[in-house]
Amino acid sequence: MKIGVIKLEKLVLIDGNSIMNRAFYGIMGSKMLTTKDGKYTNAVYGFLAILFKILEDIEPQYIAVAFDLKGKLKRKELYEGYKANRHGMPEELAEQMPIIKEVLKAMNIDIIEKEGYEGDDILGTLAKYGEKQGLEVTILSGDRDAFQLASDNITIRIPRTKAGKTETEDFNRAKVLEEYGLEPAQLIEVKALQGDTSDNIPGVPGVGPKTAISLIQRYHSVKELYEKIDSGEDDLKGKQKEN
C-alpha cells in the first residue's frame, strides 16, 4: 500500500504598495513607459509581470492583494513620528494605481484594504489565519520586515527586477535561520535595537544591523538584554552599554 503525499492548498498574499513601488522604480530607467496618449504604465507593466510569474510558479487556489489606504494609521497612535520623513507618492506612480486595481478586479483577484492599517498589517493577519487553516502561504513583498512572519508553512518571496526581468528569492523559517541565525519572530527585537530610518523609527544610538543581530543572538530578546545590563551580567562596552 502506497501512502500518497498530501499537498496543501496554496494561498498567495501580495503587498500591493510594495510591489507597485518596486515595479515603478525598477522599470523607470531614463524614460518611463507610456501609452500613445502619454499615460505612464511602467508600474502597471512591472506589477503584472511579477503577478503573472508568481501565478505561474505557485498556481495558488487562493490569492489576495492588500493595499494601504490614506488616512491616520493605528501605528501613528503608538508613535507619532512613524513615517514622518516619507514624501507622498509620485504623481506618475499614483495615477497608475487605479489601473492596477482595475486589472486585478477584471482577473477576479480580491483587493483588501482597511482604514487605519497598512497593507503589510493585513497580510500578516491573513497569513497567520491561512496557516491555521492548513494552507501553504506565500507572501509576495519587497519589504524584508515581512521575514518576521516566516514559518514552516509561510514563505516570504522577495522579487528583484533586473533589466526588465523579475527574479525572486524565498525565505521560510529555515532560510531566515540560515541568513540571520535567529528565529523569524526575533527579527522584531533586532528592529527595536537598530531602528529603521526608512520608517523614521529610532533605534539605540551606536547599534547598527550587525550589532543588533549579534546582541539578539546572544541575549535572545531586548527585555533579556536590559535585564542583564541592570544586573551587571552583560559584557557590553562603551556606547552600547551607555545607550
Predicted segment positions?
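Non-catalytic nucleic-acid-binding/docking modules located in mid-to-C-terminal regions
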Residues: 7, 59-64, 109, 132, ...
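Noncatalytic, basic helical substrate-engagement surface that gates or grips nucleic-acid strands
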Residues: 6-140, 144-170
